[in-house]
């Protein structure tokens, strides 16, 4: 059976929310957690592919996790891999930025340089704050 094609919103390659994600990345590179947190809603949730299924972190827990990361790694670069898209869905009025990052870090314990690809989805509320972030990367790469 054939279905009629239909749309579900608009995809942007230039948008204010994409700019916010870029500013967020710059804040992480500068290790400015206060500035980074300003892009999030107070009740934001964080998901990570390396966490057990169904688990998430609060904004405060994510901040502590980032501090732990800074204690153990130096971020050398975080470059856009391709370009981010902003998806303004009609269904449920979801607003999502999809971004791929080519990340290069130095592990402080032994000086090893590690490269990995990180895919992030950032869901925004109507006020333009991030309410959900999902991270997809190979966490084992950081420990090898």
What are these regions (language model features)?
Residues 1-2, 131-144:
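Low-complexity, intrinsically disordered terminal/linker segments enriched in charged
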Residues 100, 114-119:
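Short, surface-exposed coil-to-beta transition loops
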Residues 7-8, 45-57, 72:
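A short gly/proline-enriched turn/hairpin at secondary-structure junctions
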Residues 1-34, 38:
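Short, low-complexity N-terminal intrinsically disordered segments enriched in polar/charged residues
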Residues 63-110:
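Surface-exposed, charged secondary-structure patches
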Residues 24, 35-37, 44, 62, ...:
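Hydrophobic pocket/interface hotspot
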